[in-house]
Amino acid sequence: MAELRALVAVKRVIDFAVKIRVKPDRTGVVMDGVKHSMNPFCEIAVEEAVRLKEKKLVKEVIAVSCGPAQCQETIRTALAMGADRGIHVEVPAAEAHHLGPLQVARVLAKLAQKEKVDLVLLGKQAIDDDCNQTGQMTAGFLDWPQGTFASQVTLEGDKVKVEREIDGGLETLRLKLPAVVTADLRLNEPRYATLPNIMKAKKKKIEVIKAGDLGVDLTSKLSVVSVEDPPQRVAGVKVETTEDLVAKLREIGRI
């Protein structure tokens, strides 16, 4: 029986199908009354952890999320997918908007040490901020090896083999556990939570703690200056011939 334990980070984000609206004061995007769901890359990380457990390579899968009370819904989704228990690091909604990769990485590192896990899995990035920094920072705080953008994960005794896609093809890394791995899109296809598993998830434990309980200061060192909609695309003009194209480019001062 495997004795390895995995910690999986899950983030609550605005659903990918929702059209984002910027607040009138440009301090952020509208969050109230908007559908939220688990970050798609986090779903992939949960799926991979559960698959490792199903192969009896991992003993326990712990799902963790930082944010307001609604984050427990995201944790419940992870539990319905097969995670064993959850940890909610509660952050008031007013403060949660300022959570960045640095603060979350500090929390994950402390939890990894507290729970004595062997593997930290998380999505390579979140679709709301696209930072792609949390996994790397977590590994840095823990001084653990890291495998980012994983398209295949294989546990081999006290090591984990990570295959990752790079511009020139595939790169294979072999990391000594404990380690941090971030999931890429091609790692797996996440399962849908079935109704029976959703019902079972309601009975699974979610521990609620504060960042202060871990000795972590969530004060952000960054401030958002402005959030704006992308500029509207100007309609193009069709031209029939090369000569017309050259004339048009000259007209607008491009040549």
UniProtKB/Swiss-Prot annotation:
Its main location: mitochondrion. CDD domains: ETF_beta (cd01714). The modification N-acetylalanine is found at residue 2. Methylated. Trimethylation at Lys-200 and Lys-203 may negatively regulate the activity in electron transfer from acyl-CoA dehydrogenases. Residues 183-205 are annotated as: Recognition loop. AMP binds at residues 9, 39-42, 66, 123-134. Disulfide bonds: none annotated. GO terms for biological process: amino acid catabolic process; fatty acid beta-oxidation using acyl-CoA dehydrogenase; respiratory electron transport chain. Heterodimeric electron transfer flavoprotein that accepts electrons from several mitochondrial dehydrogenases, including acyl-CoA dehydrogenases, glutaryl-CoA and sarcosine dehydrogenase. It transfers the electrons to the main mitochondrial respiratory chain via ETF-ubiquinone oxidoreductase. Required for normal mitochondrial fatty acid oxidation and normal amino acid metabolism. ETFB binds an AMP molecule that probably has a purely structural role. The recognition loop recognizes a hydrophobic patch at the surface of interacting dehydrogenases and acts as a static anchor at the interface. Heterodimer composed of ETFA and ETFB. Identified in a complex that contains ETFA, ETFB and ETFRF1. Interacts with ACADM. This is Electron transfer flavoprotein subunit beta. The gene is ETFB.
